[in-house]
């Protein structure tokens, strides 16, 4: 007999070789009906695997986070089985679980179509209804390689060859479909998600490398309840309507083109939004005691080597070959640039330390809060680029706080206050905080890490904020905080960060004179609120579905005339608004008023000032608000006051 320890701490005895299925059945039939797998000593296992030693056992139910992941993994395998039956010449590659769903990569010459997805979905339903057993088998490596070679599944052969010799080769069989997989899985295909949907097809590369073979990726989602699936599909539909790439084109905010992949062309309206946000942040940080600086966009390789970025970040840096340039132009051959490459900066921190080091600093100068709206460049594979959300050229609302170890808590508290106010102003009242502590591989002593971690936690607790812990997810140079926003359709976006850094001050020889007169290293707090302007603007566009609040709207008021008698009055009002720093546009064309209103509301202009003969004679304005059919009559001074009231 063996002891089985249950989640409530109780101990029951079972025969050696008892399965998780037998244990859960003996405890509760209702629990068993919801159980999809078991956790044995915190390791997920199939229900039918024998347990031969004393262990802790916990049921993994279909409504738990782990249960849903297993459900989605099952559905990915059913997708692969369906594709192999319908398109036998297709190779199946890999099919992991992702947030809210799963995908499976396939190697196939002919692209999958939307009609194909419908046929595949029906075949998947048939497989689920058939309720084939899902069985785990352990094969010899040679047998597995030979089997998949015969099946012409050459990607599976590559995967097996990469598995360490010390690991067993586990295979899952359901019906006549066999796949390489670690598991665990449900006992049969009938357990699998009856509530699923294949959502899209996209291109992919083997191993995510654009130099490798092209693949086709089918995405899907799966849920334990129909209501959950319906809710997710509604959010997905909303996300598609709000897609910033689509709205960016329609509203003429920005565009991308092949000649500058990953680098946006900002149109007038989009650049207006950019400048509004920049001016707002600049004002906020000035009030918070920051100095604003500007550092070179291009820096020499030697500095990047000293900072450590050349070693760790080289593949993501854009570099310039100055040797060739200088030889072509017969310039001086012994300059420092001829011996080293230049690189476009991927971040601002090394440049900020150069400014800090330029003059001797005293402990009285700390904390020193240094900010920059720095233009940065990072190489991202073309397949990873995604509108404004993933770019190669971007501007950060970056700042570095040079402080002592004893000042970390106070500076963190001040930063959190600033960050929350900014998010509130942009329409994100809820902020989640994640705290990431020391990783296994790290710089600095345990004593320094203890102090830094305690300082961050103390700051969060002083603010009364809830937080979650990401164990071991801190940077190698210090712990960090991440700040997550929730948008209008429930999606989470990580934007703000605060990272403690003990390493960079040492590498770049930053120091200050302590109260005892000795040289000491400052601590650097790397912090950002928005992250990159580009990504944050993309988030704003999707959050507001393009209908930006008055203070952010590139055009705040459209002044339109109904009749010729109102043209002069319209021109006069338009000029008055401009003189009061209100972003106004004027339409005195002969188009019908309904056409004008529709055009400006399609362009998401918050307010339309409608002027006819009556308004011209009375000196009043008929105002229509975006999304409303009602008109309100006000004066120009009231309109100006209303817009100013909304300014941040």
Swiss-Prot record:
One of its GO terms (cellular component) is cytoplasm. Residues 1-61 form the TGS domain. Residues 243-549 are annotated as: Catalytic. It comes from Orientia tsutsugamushi (strain Ikeda) (Rickettsia tsutsugamushi). This is Threonine--tRNA ligase. GO terms for molecular function: ATP binding; metal ion binding; threonine-tRNA ligase activity; tRNA binding. Zn(2+) binds at residues 349, 400, 526. Belongs to the class-II aminoacyl-tRNA synthetase family. It is an enzyme of class 6 (ligase).
